[in-house]
Every structure is written in structure tokens, then in C-alpha cells.
């Protein structure tokens, strides 16, 4: 059985200093959680004009679950060590905003190989729950 759903994915803009919202209609197996589908789409990236890869494409999603309205995203080491042309906060909030937009999810906790006690790119502590941040989102694609 499949389900159809429109999701909002947040990718980096061309300069990597802001997020671009990309609405997408997806078809997925109802045995797979929509948050897993969202993360797979973010990792895969997009060909949409004005949207650029925000997460290293060889990142692996090790696990994802929702407990008490917090989505726990456990990613492989590549997430922390491989680079994309996006500022640290853009990468973090591409995940947070994409998942926080889903029903039943208020916040996001990011782990790397099960560990959240680390600094992402020496800039952002992962030892916290992140919430939607609309300040990073470009309102107009022509701003790229």
C-alpha cells in the first residue's frame, strides 16, 4: 500500500547561507515512516532550480524515531566529516525545518553514530533539541 503526501523540504540556496523551501508531492510505502522518507529525500538532494545539496550525499540514515514529539535522527559519520557548500546552521536547519513541518513533530535531536555530545563542524553543539527556524528561509527565490 502506498500513501501520497505533500512535504516541504528545505535545501541550501546557491551561496549556502540560507534555506530554500521546496514543496514536493511524494508517494511512499505506508510501512515506511514519513520522517524517514523526508530524510532520504534531503540526503538524495534535488534538481529543483535554486535548491542545492544541504547534507553530504554519502550520509547514511542509521535510524530515525519520534518520541514525545521529538524526532531523533541518527546519522553516519559522513554527516559530520564530509563537506557541502552550506553553512553549518543551514545544514542543521535543513533537517530541522523539513522534519518539524511534519505532523506530530515539534523538535529534532540530531545524533552522529548515536552520539549527540559533539560539536557539528566545531560550530554548533548537537547536545540540544532544535526547533523550526524560519529566519534562515529565503522568501523569494530571486534572492539567490
Where are the regions a protein language model picked out?
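Bimodal "functional hotspot" detector
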Residues: 1-144
